[in-house]
Amino acid sequence: MKNVVIAAGYATRLGELTKNFPKPLLKIGENTILGRMLDDIDRIPEIDEHIIITNHKFAPIFEEWVHANTLIKEHESNESNEYSCHSSYSCSKYTKPITVVDDGTETNETRLGAVCDLLFAMEQLQVDDDLLVVAADNLLFFSFQEFVDFAKEKQTSCIMCHEQPSIEKLQRTGVVEVDEQMRVLGMEEKPQVPKSHWAVPPFYI
């Protein structure tokens, strides 16, 4: 199973703080947001590689962050597409290799979006494996191991959800309808009239 980290946004709402620096690499205490996430996911036995998909503007910063924990740079590819490039590293801090993929975009207006970035990374690396897909800019206080175990038990694609009583918060996130067996019946993004209280964070298998 590959861990695909979606980190290609431009975090424009944070203003100067992320004008020239990616939000996932902001420090919270002694660690970055992304670092805290990988610290957990790297311990999951089923995960054999981390793939970070980012944009052309921030790719060098992610490369530098990965390189800070690097023992050996294993592979670099830059094929016919000017922006179709990726690098893989074996890291001293993490037991699984980290691959950084540059999606070629340079502005918020030209960004691909999460789904297209995911497809881009899969095509560039020719991935044919199960995926844990996570958004890189979330501060977490739980382990993904239980989520992976749940997906293995159910033998199907899974999304993470949690009960959210606040209508205002539901209007700012994805919301799913589920049946009694927690099978997804429908999903809406930022609905003005939520059909359930099940909020969906950006974590998928």
Show where each model-derived region lies:
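Short alpha-helical oligomerization interface
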Residues: 19-23
